[in-house]
Amino acid sequence: MEETTIPFKSLHSREYQGHKKKVHSVAWNSNGTKLASGSVDQTARIWNIEPHGHSKAKDLELKGHTDSVDQLCWDPKHSDLVATASGDKSVRLWDARSGKCTQQVELSGENINITYKPDGTHVAVGNRDDELTILDVRKFKPLHRRKFNYEVNEIAWNMPGDFFFLTTGLGTVEVLSYPSLKPLDTLTAHTAGCYCIAIDPKGRYFAVGSADSLVSLWDISDMLCLRTFTKLEWPVRTISFNYSGEYIASASEDLFIDIANVQTGRTVHQIPCRAAMNSVEWNPKYNLLAYAGDDKNPKYNTDEGVFRIFGFESS
C-alpha cells in the first residue's frame, strides 16, 4: 500500500457530546462498532458508531463509579464487555448492551491504567501508587499483586501474552515474562519518563511515548529500537497504531495529533486540535481515529466533555 492511498487530507472529524466534564479515555470494541468514553464526570458512555453512516449516535451511560473514569478497555474476545478503571479504587466490568455493571472489585489505590490480555482471560490494572494488579476475568478477583519502587505508567501485553511491558518514570521499559512476572529485560528507551505504550496489531513492533517528546518504535522480537518519531514538542501522552500497523498516531500538549508512516517515520497528516490530548485510539477495522482531550468552552472556560473521531468522508 502506497502512502498516498489514504486521502487523509480530505477526511473529516465529527464531534460527540454527552459527558459533563473532560474525557480521559476513548476505546473501540473488538469489531469496531462501538466506542467507549470515560470521563472526569464519573461516568463512561457507549456509542454505536457507523463507519460510513451518519453522525447521529445514540449513547448509553454507565453509572456507578464515584470518581473519575481514567481509563477503559474492551474485552478483546467479547464485543459487548468493557472494563473501567477509576480513581474510586474500583475496577468495573460492564455489559455494553444493557449498561449494567456485571462485576466489580475494590483495589488498594486510585486506578489510572487498565489493559486486557489479548486472549481475554486476564486484566492488568495500574494505580497511582505504582502497584500492578492482575485480575482473573472470570472470577474478577486478583491473581497477582506487585508494588514497584519506581513510577509505573502505561502497561501492555504482547500479542501471544507471554511478555508484559511496563513503561516507567525512569525512561525505561521493563519487560517481564508472563505469568511469572519475572524480569526479562530493561530497555533504556528515553532520556525522560516513558508515559505510554502501544502494541502493533500485527505483532511486529511496540511503540513508546515519552516526556522527552519522542515516540520510539521497537522490534518486538529482538527488543531493538528501529526509529523515533520527532514531530511533537511536548511530553507524549497517548499513542496508537492503526489496524494495519502502517500508521501511528501520537498526541501531547501540542495542538495537533501527528499521524506518521511506521515504516518511513514520515508524517503523513496532522489533525489540528484545540487542547492537550488525553487519549487517541484507532478503530480495529477502519481508519477512524478517536481522540479526546482537555477541551474547554472558550466562553465559560468550563470542560466541554467532548471527543471526536477523525476519518469520515463528510463532517
From Swiss-Prot:
UniProt keyword list: mRNA processing, mRNA splicing, mRNA transport, Nucleus, Repeat, RNA-binding, RNA-mediated gene silencing, Transport, WD repeat
The protein, known as: THO complex subunit 3
Gene that this polypeptide is encoded by: THO3
InterPro entries referenced in this protein's UniProt entry, alphabetically: G-protein_beta_WD-40_rep, Tex1/THOC3, WD40/YVTN_repeat-like_dom_sf, WD40_repeat_CS, WD40_repeat_dom_sf, WD40_rpt
Example of a GO cellular component annotation carried by this entry: Cul4-RING E3 ubiquitin ligase complex
Keyword tRNA processing: no
Molecular function via GO: RNA binding
Coiled coil regions in record: none
Effect of residue 86 to F: In attex1-2; reduced levels of endogenous trans-acting small interfering RNA (ta-siRNA)
S-S bridge residues: none
Lineage: Eukaryota, Viridiplantae, Streptophyta, Embryophyta, Tracheophyta
Disruption phenotype: Developmental defects as well as reduced levels of endogenous trans-acting small interfering RNA (ta-siRNA).
Family: Belongs to the THOC3 family.
Subunit-structure text: Component of the THO complex, which is composed of THO1, THO2, THO3, THO5, THO6 and THO7.
Function: Acts as a component of the THO subcomplex of the TREX complex which is thought to couple mRNA transcription, processing and nuclear export. Contributes to the integrity of the endogenous trans-acting small interfering RNA (ta-siRNA) pathway. May process or transport a long RNA molecule so that it can be a template for secondary siRNA production. May participate in the trafficking of siRNA precursors to the ARGONAUTE catalytic center. Required for the generation of functional messenger ribonucleoproteins (mRNPs).
SMART domains: WD40 (SM00320)
Taxonomic superkingdom: Eukaryota
